[in-house]
């Protein structure tokens, strides 16, 4: 019997369990990615894109990218797996730099991710630079 990927299940899974689902095939990985995406709130006028193959490099079992309409930067939520034992939220400038981990989570905390996304969207709308958004997000988001 297949386990339903609820928020509670996502919060209790370890890195190996995320890797096991990725290894089970593309359908399973898609279901996992969609389960994570269902728990997140993308800011208005931002796109939310999940990785299903290796579009974003294929380093994580789950990677969801959030991008404002102007596409000058994006925030990427990356799950635990072989590369990292924790969840990380990374801000990447469109040119690749600056690049910063703005949030680290020992367990999936969708409300903290959604808060960080809303904060970045608000700062962006107010005209803050990408560097400022990184520093403020790091100070606000930090470790969860």
From Swiss-Prot:
Does the keyword field hold Phosphoprotein?
no
Q: Where are the transmembrane segments?
A: none
Pfam families from the xrefs? PsiB
Superkingdom in the source lineage: Bacteria
Instruction: Output the InterPro entries linked to this UniProt entry.
Output: Plasmid_inh_PsiB, PsiB-like_sf
Q: Which UniProt keywords apply?
A: Plasmid
Q: Which residues form the signal peptide?
A: none
Similarity annotation: To PsiB protein of plasmid R6-5.
* Role played: In contrast to PsiB protein of plasmid R6-5, this protein is unable to prevent SOS induction for potentially two reasons: less activity and/or insufficient expression.
Q: Which NCBIfam families match?
A: PRK13701.1
The name this protein carries in UniProt is Protein PsiB
> What is the organism field in this record?
Escherichia coli (strain K12)
Gene name tied to this protein: psiB
